[in-house]
């Protein structure tokens, strides 16, 4: 049972039918005010960047070995190595019940790291918990790269949903919009999720997203594979070139995500990912070749009876207005009691002994307008 399937992505059987989840990042108990809190989009931000901003050659880390001086590079929109404690995120501003900036001998670099821990007991008391530092970037941009080093501790359920990247106009908030289609002239977002199999996926909401109701992604009653109810949970894209067996736990992983808005009126938006500096997948115009089935794009095609012949991916039409730009990052470890317990039970069925808590460590987080590369 893969968590990414158990959690709210419709899992198709050989006939093309699916089981539908009912909750997707509910109004959770979080460690910070929501992104629509007063002051988040206050005046004073720098003017939006444009594609005409000329990038430098090479990776940012090549110009800043050991991340030395990286925070001051003009391409950098956000930087936190946690060495100076809290203060760089909009919220929280201090440790919480689930988030801790701490000195550690396993910190990726330097002496300190961020730890996000949610326990089974805490979930019994509050069945939706988000351990979610958030930050509004120094300016909204059309092309964004985010690099972080993460470490999944021990054998434990992974988050129901993980890191969120939000784009929008000045007034758009991506919170509390599960099972909705966001307006193209207001905003969109995606999560970077980790399954129980320790593989990653994009989980995207945008105004051209597909429904899980029908095989072809529409929501027309009586369609082929009709599920009988209309729903719009995130569309799933699993980068195809990840390591067999997934990532290693109890080791630092370098993750970098690239995201690009579309030209208004075109489908040339893209999402891409690197793990430990190795490209593992890009979803953009013409790549990869694969098959849509309901609300999931299958790189290389799929084998269910409802699957059609693979074709090149069409690209993303994320937005319909120019002022919809990438603006906010949530380092969100979001858990639900029901999926946490099902994942724990699945681990037990595999002969494993999961912990009674889920912990992820973070270090060396950077957002920029250029490729960053892993810290070295």
What are the roles of these predicted feature ranges?
Residues 1, 6-62, 67-68:
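Ser/Thr-rich, Pro/Gly/Ala-heavy low-complexity intrinsically disordered linkers and tails
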Residues 51-94:
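Extracellular carbohydrate-recognition regions
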Residues 67-68, 132-138, 239-246:
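Beta-strand-rich interaction surfaces with strong enrichment in secreted/lumenal proteins
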Residues 82, 252-311:
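Carbohydrate-binding surfaces in secreted/extracellular proteins
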Residues 86-122:
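Extracellular glycan-recognition surfaces and repeat-rich motifs
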Residues 107-231, 358-361, 366-375:
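Secretory/extracellular carbohydrate-interaction modules
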Residues 141-143, 149, 239-258, 268:
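Trp-centered recognition loops
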Residues 285-360:
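Flexible glycan-contacting loops in extracellular carbohydrate-active proteins
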